[in-house]
């Protein structure tokens, strides 16, 4: 075993926990420094989901992806900051304070995997692991100017991921370039018997830049209302670059986009209200002295342990699942979700990948979006891929006012290789 010391100048607050001295072995990632999002279990290292309620929780086991990384020789150097339990788009909803965008400390890095993106963008680590429930890898990748992949649902084991919304979230890689991302992905993808949703589809692929004959779907909805015209123009130029390399752009539509955001928030909050019911604040988190009933004590522990946004989403989800509202909200959300899947299936009969902006705008200022509904709207372009379970990637494609813009590429089920090749081709074409 070899040793590595890690004392980063973390001026952007990318990390919650760092490991000063790391041991690592031989393998395809030998000595590669990797940061891990703090909702992914690491044996012997505090894992808090950036929440007070898990303060002091030290997992007795590693998540499957962490085991794979260690077996590949990676040096896991710390746990990164995030929006509490993955609920946010800015990494401002953390019990440990916000992470700053390395490119402009007055702006957010995106979320919820903002710490992972910031650590990579700031050059503190070679690559990072995040999780993506509705854009939580792709959003910070776009805002920080790095590459981030949400794999096809089931292609990476979720064993050891502290769940927020099981049917939506997926662990994925983040890196400064496509080749490094591909190397990391080749290690973490594959079957795991401990995750019932895991699929035996390992990733053993080296990116290629030949995209001759590739058909790129360009949905009208990705360039419509709510999208900054400057962002739209930068992304269209990126698609032009891909066309100059032999691809063909094909206009298309995703009519179900108008339902996607509502369906997503009903689904994810419903699943969160169930998943987070187990956190009682008794074993970990802040001590709340009370002589009241167990019911009151449980309520006070959770109020003290959970942040405002987490409490809001638990309440929303509980409401959606209530007997009198289940059909009105949750069942309708699942119908809309199927419509999104159907739209992707229809489009992918005629095209190979879908391209558009990752985010409607560039990274906004810290504290700028205090209205929750306004914040939720920024997920409009990323949630459809999670609802459908298809792979999606963000790659930097230009800048506006010195801040990066992300090109989002979405692929067919289990055709992660194709969107990675497309991103690699674009990266090489711009170089």
Curated annotation (Swiss-Prot):
Gene Ontology terms: cellular component: glutamyl-tRNA(Gln) amidotransferase complex
Single Gene Ontology MF annotation: glutaminyl-tRNA synthase (glutamine-hydrolyzing) activity
Alphabetical keyword list: ATP-binding, Ligase, Nucleotide-binding, Protein biosynthesis
Tree of life domain: Archaea
Secreted in keyword set: no
Residues of the active site: 37 (charge relay system), 112 (charge relay system), 136 (acyl-ester intermediate)
Catalytic reaction annotation: L-glutamyl-tRNA(Gln) + L-glutamine + ATP + H2O = L-glutaminyl-tRNA(Gln) + L-glutamate + ADP + phosphate + H(+)
EC number, as in UniProt: 6.3.5.7
Signal peptide: none
Annotated coiled-coil segments of the chain: none
InterPro entries documented for this protein: Amidase (IPR000120), Amidase_CS (IPR020556), Amidase_dom (IPR023631), AS_sf (IPR036928), GatA (IPR004412)
HAMAP family recorded: GatA
Sequence similarity: Belongs to the amidase family. GatA subfamily.
Function: Allows the formation of correctly charged Gln-tRNA(Gln) through the transamidation of misacylated Glu-tRNA(Gln) in organisms which lack glutaminyl-tRNA synthetase. The reaction takes place in the presence of glutamine and ATP through an activated gamma-phospho-Glu-tRNA(Gln).
Subunit comment: Heterotrimer of A, B and C subunits.
Name listed for the protein in its UniProt record: Glutamyl-tRNA(Gln) amidotransferase subunit A
Gene that encodes it: gatA
């Amino acid at each position: 075993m070899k040793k590595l010391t890690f004392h980063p100048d973390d001026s952007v607050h990318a990390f919650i926990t760092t490991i000063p001295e790391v041991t690592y072995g031989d393998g395809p990632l030998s000595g590669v420094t990797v940061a891990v999002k703090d909702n992914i279990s690491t044996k012997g290292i505090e894992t808090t989901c950036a929440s007070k309620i898990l303060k002091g929780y030290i997992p007795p086991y590693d998540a499957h992806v962490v085991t794979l990384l260690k077996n590949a020789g990676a040096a896991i150097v710390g746990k990164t900051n995030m929006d509490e339990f993955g609920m946010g788009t800015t990494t401002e909803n953390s019990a440990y304070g916000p992470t700053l965008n390395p490119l402009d400390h007055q702006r957010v890095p995106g979320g919820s995997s903002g710490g992972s993106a910031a650590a990579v963008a700031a050059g503190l680590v070679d690559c990072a692991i995040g999780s993506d429930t509705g854009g939580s890898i792709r959003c910070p990748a776009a805002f920080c100017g790095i590459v981030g992949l949400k794999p096809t649902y089931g292609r990476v084991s979720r064993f050891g991921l502290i769940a927020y919304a099981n049917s939506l979230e997926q662990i994925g890689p983040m890196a400064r370039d496509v080749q490094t991302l591909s190397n990391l992905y080749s290690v973490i993808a594959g079957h795991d018997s401990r995750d019932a949703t895991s699929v035996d589809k390992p990733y053993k692929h080296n990116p290629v830049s030949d995209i001759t004959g590739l058909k790129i779907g360009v949905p009208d909805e990705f360039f419509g209302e709510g999208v900054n015209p400057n962002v739209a123009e930068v992304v269209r130029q990126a698609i032009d670059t891909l066309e100059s390399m032999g691809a063909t752009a094909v206009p298309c539509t995703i009519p179900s986009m108008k339902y996607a955001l509502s369906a997503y928030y009903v689904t994810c909050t419903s699943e969160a209200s169930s998943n987070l019911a187990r956190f009682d604040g008794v074993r970990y988190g802040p001590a709340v002295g009370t002589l009241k009933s167990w019911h009151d004590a449980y309520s006070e522990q959770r109020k003290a342990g959970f942040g405002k946004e987490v409490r809001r989403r638990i309440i929303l989800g509980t409401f959606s699942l209530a007997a009198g509202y289940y059909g009105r909200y949750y069942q309708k959300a699942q119908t809309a979700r199927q419509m999104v899947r159907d739209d992707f299936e229809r489009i992918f009969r005629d095209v190979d990948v879908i391209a558009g902006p990752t985010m409607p705008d560039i990274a906004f200022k810290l504290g700028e979006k205090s209205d929750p509904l306004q914040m939720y709207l920024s997920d409009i372009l990323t949630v459809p891929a999670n609802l459908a379970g298809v792979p999606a990637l963000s790659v930097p494609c230009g800048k506006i006012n010195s801040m990066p813009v992300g090109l989002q590429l979405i692929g067919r089920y289990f055709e992660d290789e194709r969107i990675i090749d497309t991103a690699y081709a674009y990266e090489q074409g711009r170089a």
